[in-house]
Amino acid sequence: MRLVIATCSVDYVGRLTAHLPKATRLLMVKADGSVSVHADDRAYKPLNWMTPPCTLTVHPIAIDDPDTDFTDGSSVGNSEEQGTDGSAHTAHEEELWVVENKKGEQLRITVHDKISDTTYDLGEDPGLTKDGVEAHLQELLAQHPEALGEGFTLVRREYPTPIGPVDILTRDASGKTVAVEVKRRGGIDGVEQLTRYVELLNRDEILAPVQGLFAAQEIKPQARTLAEDRGFTCVTVDYDELRGTPSQELRLF
């Protein structure tokens, strides 16, 4: 993980446009390729971000031409591909970071002055251990996939992927694959996790097209907005009601 504290300005160019004026911020570049811009507030929420898969390219800026317009990338110096470990760090005082995803959306960060630039190898994270209620909720939904939608059937619980297991993999009434992320309280982090799973599973020709479903006892408004914006279905589930539903699994005793 690379952590850069710098004076910077940020422009997002995509379906919408957004601008952050020049200020001191934290730039976070993770090993998975994601880049996020943070201020000293908003808890864990970034001001702007780009999720993987995306590429980060660094362009040195001519210091003697501060008023140059860089919106088309034509007035910058030689560019170099930037690895997430920061190994290709340029010696120029000012830089233009262009972060671009597969859809062509860009996060353009003009770094005016670096205060700190540090890279850490955090290694592989073991991930979160679900609490008792959340783990049981996942188990109950796997037993009763119809609670997620009429006609839903279970493919597999804890479906393995290279980036971790999908909580539940199902098929809807029309036979389409649906990846389900289960949370006790659904927040933005859960939506981001589901996004990564869906993007990865859609590369599998057998499973594609894969849709996403975000299931939780409670879904925060911001998380619901983000999930629906990404085309995911949101389902609020009643844990107590599910606990009282007889299991359809065959039991010996």
From Swiss-Prot:
Function: Cleaves both 3' and 5' ssDNA extremities of branched DNA structures.
Intracellular or extracellular location(s): Cytoplasm
Gene3D superfamilies, A to Z: 2.70.180.20, 3.40.1350.10
Predominant localisation class: cytoplasm
Class of the enzyme per the UniProt entry, highest EC level: hydrolase
GO cellular component: cytoplasm
Stretches with biased composition (Polar residues): 71-87
UniProt similarity note: Belongs to the NucS endonuclease family.
Protein source organism: Corynebacterium kroppenstedtii (strain DSM 44385 / JCM 11950 / CIP 105744 / CCUG 35717)
HAMAP family linked: NucS
Protein name from the UniProt record: Endonuclease NucS
Entry EC number(s): 3.1.-.-
Pfam families the record matches: NucS_C, NucS_N
Gene Ontology terms, MF aspect: DNA binding; single-stranded DNA endodeoxyribonuclease activity
Protein keywords: Cytoplasm, DNA-binding, Endonuclease, Hydrolase, Nuclease
InterPro entries linked to this entry: Endonuclease_NucS, NucS_C, NucS_N, NucS_N_sf, tRNA_endonuc-like_dom_sf
Region Disordered, residue ranges: 63-91
